[in-house]
Amino acid sequence: YFSELELTQITLLTLSLTLVFVSIKNGLRVNNNYSIIKPALGKSLAHVGFGLLILSVVANGTFAREKIFQAKVNDTLQIDNYTFKFDSVEQTKGVNFNAITATFHLMNDQTVMDTFTPEIRVYSNPPTVTSETSIIRKLLTDIYVVMNVPENSNFVNVRIHVKPMISFIWLSVILMAIGGLSAIVFRFKKIR
């Protein structure tokens, strides 16, 4: 029923959730005085971070979406449950570059939820063309809108990425660092 890739993802998700819950349970062990055992808490915090890292990387790899559009002004672009309205394109000038800036609105019914302004920048010295990504970060999902160099004046090539759980990758690294540092601190205090 499942492909080999899906079984691997299910296995990794299950193992990471198990690691997170077991680490939380072990980290909250109490001694005879009903106080939390501090060295175990640091170790468990680092393991929770590692489990969360695996969980968020697998979830991102599994549920991330990308769609490429050829769009013109006033087009509506749909990716999963997200609707984007391509509002405008204009030329702007920066300190050392000229840019083509597009405006996309993330819509909910007729309400604008967020605004994206990706750019194509042309630098004169040295001559370079770059695409500047517009990113909106939410708690559970990051959304990227990238505009590529237009092939003609009627359409703009647009890539929209929906990346879930990116924030949790950063949170997991912070948890691992705090857990590791606290385990080291409590170990040094115990030695003295």
Would you name each region that the model predicts?
Residues 1-192:
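Solvent-exposed, non-transmembrane regions of integral membrane proteins
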